[in-house]
């Protein structure tokens, strides 16, 4: 599905799938849980899902003649960390807008974790007071104009790389990769669980798995706390991506499954249940999830298993998208583990 598109390799190769034996047993053993470790996909600044997306965006950036990647996210954005890493790797400058997406008061929130790594890698990081929104941001557009005014040649990458024209391609590739791994494993996964906010990971998966009739078996766990906007954006990205890869059918609203129950109390702030899920999977599997994204999708998967959402005997693949560096910004919440 992706042969027609240029790809700039940024990852090690196919990410491993592991059985979550102890978590499976802890939850009763009726649903078999696995994880695909996108958090271990690269040596670039701790890796993560954004690299799959950027592999299909960077060839366009290079071909454009740009010299500066310009992107945006929250203060502890995993995406902007990855943009900074890729800029360093390919010899570009990097301008990052870090907005106040999270009402979080940890004393060192804007000096540790992802934003610290971006600064170490040489990005020009600017803090902005604007609040959370997954759409196109004025502060980002202003940064692009400022780079131009200073004589630079900017290449614009939106939040999460999601609404970029090629933003969904990387996770079409994820689906193709999973199919190859399923052939080696001797079984197919019944469900794939993924955290959904800006939407292109979910959208790309839905398109990729639509090829074999599993689009609506991709279960998005909303972490945006703006589910209507998120659902609409996932569908829009999926429709555009399906056209790009010549899927052969339209992506429909019923292809996009988004569970809304776990994003509370607000984007970027973990509930007690999210923190409990982070601790549980850490103590059972040694697997680290973050308070903004993966902790909430892990909470969701655990709760859905407990509620019987997945039929007995199901094999469920959890897409671990990364994000652990953000934990550093939540040190007080986890001061006792």
UniProtKB/Swiss-Prot annotation:
The lineage of its organism: Bacteria, Pseudomonadati, Pseudomonadota, Alphaproteobacteria, Hyphomicrobiales. It comes from Allorhizobium ampelinum (strain ATCC BAA-846 / DSM 112012 / S4) (Agrobacterium vitis (strain S4)). This is 1-aminocyclopropane-1-carboxylate deaminase. Keywords: Hydrolase, Pyridoxal phosphate. It comes from the Bacteria. The keyword Hydrolase applies. Gene3D superfamilies: 3.40.50.1100. It holds the Pfam family PALP. The gene is acdS. It catalyses: 1-aminocyclopropane-1-carboxylate + H2O = 2-oxobutanoate + NH4(+). Homotrimer.
